[in-house]
Amino acid sequence: MGAQKTIAYLAIIAIAVIFAQVNTAPPVGHYAANNTNKSHNLVVGYRMPGDRLVLRQSVIKNSSWGRIVVEERTFNVSSWERITMIQALDQKTNGNGAYASITNGGPGNQNVTIRLKSQRGHGINFVIEIYSRY
């Protein structure tokens, strides 16, 4: 009888410990649940030692009431360089920013064409950064 009580007691403690560990674990996707920054950044490629920032340019277009604003820009690097990484950083952090996409070129090429499309009734405010290497 004493052994059965001891086993039951240990089973209850084991269950309590398991529930305590499950309940204290951080929620899955905690970073994604953090809604403080809702920017629509585009990052393509990756940097390696020896890469350098060859272009940093702001792209700003005012909003047009009830309309979608589209801006398409082509960026080039010198003929002996290749693009390794492109960052289109949305400066609006409230979720009203534009969306960036690459329509031509990109990492491994000497040029890239980026299309920026705003949400209806909002403008465009991006910083474009291009990294390359020889």
UniProtKB/Swiss-Prot annotation:
Keyword annotations from UniProtKB, A to Z: Secreted, Signal
Principal localisation: secreted
GO CC aspect terms: extracellular region
Subcellular location as annotated: Secreted
Entries under InterPro entries matching the protein: MBF2 (IPR031734)
Annotated signal sequence range: 1-24
Keyword Secreted: yes
The keyword Secreted belongs to this UniProt entry's keyword annotation: yes
Highest rank taxon of the organism: Eukaryota
Annotated source species: Bombus ignitus (Bumblebee)
PANTHER family, per the entry: GEO11136P1-RELATED (PTHR37685:SF1)
Protein name according to UniProt: Probable salivary secreted peptide
